[in-house]
């Protein structure tokens, strides 16, 4: 953890033992250890839930486990690099990142590597890259940079909020062509929430919301499967072996888990009964094997992750690190919304959406991007605490 240590403390400070030790800690320990804990839980549940699918696809029970280890190794190496990148670099290159994301989305459509009727992936050897995940992070970086530069205009002029909305709509069109309706919802709600949080007028955002709803409704109507998803959501038991199959199997998994679960590795629904058991519906398998108490514990850990991310943003804003603060708050919104949609989907609260559960679901691109965003949060917290410590040392010298 040498990255989070600082050499500016070169003389003892008479602040008491507790404060003296805390001044050396330049990262959020709660966030860091919760992140590791969730990744560990995710690895265990993926290892359990992916065995039947691995046998069916590759005749290898460890097929997905091996791939996860590769993804985790790549993610670890990139995390070390990202922790060393100053946040100002992300701000300066946010527009280029967004442009690259758009190019990758277009490339995915051209290559048309279709899986389950969706063209969302760029194949690179045996690895699959999903540009939609990168587009979330790059757009959030761009939005934070825009709000940092145009903070006064956003509060006073309606047209100032139109530019990020237009760019969001362009991304939404590219995502819809894949199609990836879940990512569109994430971008749409996160954008409106952050604009409101940082000064945009509520009446203007309501106008934008209504306008976009009128755009979205025809897109739902022209695709029969989307209408069917909504109808199935109201009562999946009307068609338990057809359109409601995935949701009913998910609910059965929750019911089997009861309070304390069936035990690790003892899930029955993962045996080809529940589709996407190790990806979008991994929380159902977790609830079946660990029970309601295990599921609630994981939800609590995820909630604290989202809360700590918002606290990191608040600290950065307090010392006028506006880009860092807006970025951290945006990432917190993104994580919280995606967690809510995934858990709501598998528990029957929301219509089904193809969104993974952050840090836990199998998915190389989604896991890599969420961990990258988490490393950005740790870097923001590091720079914030470092600035506070430097200011404190200047005060002690006066």
Curated annotation (Swiss-Prot):
Compartment(s) where it occurs, according to its Swiss-Prot or TrEMBL record: Cell inner membrane
Function text: Peptidoglycan polymerase that is essential for cell division.
Enzyme class: transferase
Family annotation (Pfam families): FTSW_RODA_SPOVE
Protein name (database record): Probable peptidoglycan glycosyltransferase FtsW
Alphabetic keyword roster: Cell cycle, Cell division, Cell inner membrane, Cell membrane, Cell shape, Cell wall biogenesis/degradation, Glycosyltransferase, Membrane, Peptidoglycan synthesis, Transferase, Transmembrane, Transmembrane helix
Encoding gene, per UniProt annotation: ftsW
GO molecular function (one): peptidoglycan glycosyltransferase activity
GO biological process per UniProt: cell wall organization; FtsZ-dependent cytokinesis; peptidoglycan biosynthetic process; regulation of cell shape
Catalytic reaction equation(s): [GlcNAc-(1->4)-Mur2Ac(oyl-L-Ala-gamma-D-Glu-L-Lys-D-Ala-D-Ala)](n)-di-trans,octa-cis-undecaprenyl diphosphate + beta-D-GlcNAc-(1->4)-Mur2Ac(oyl-L-Ala-gamma-D-Glu-L-Lys-D-Ala-D-Ala)-di-trans,octa-cis-undecaprenyl diphosphate = [GlcNAc-(1->4)-Mur2Ac(oyl-L-Ala-gamma-D-Glu-L-Lys-D-Ala-D-Ala)](n+1)-di-trans,octa-cis-undecaprenyl diphosphate + di-trans,octa-cis-undecaprenyl diphosphate + H(+)
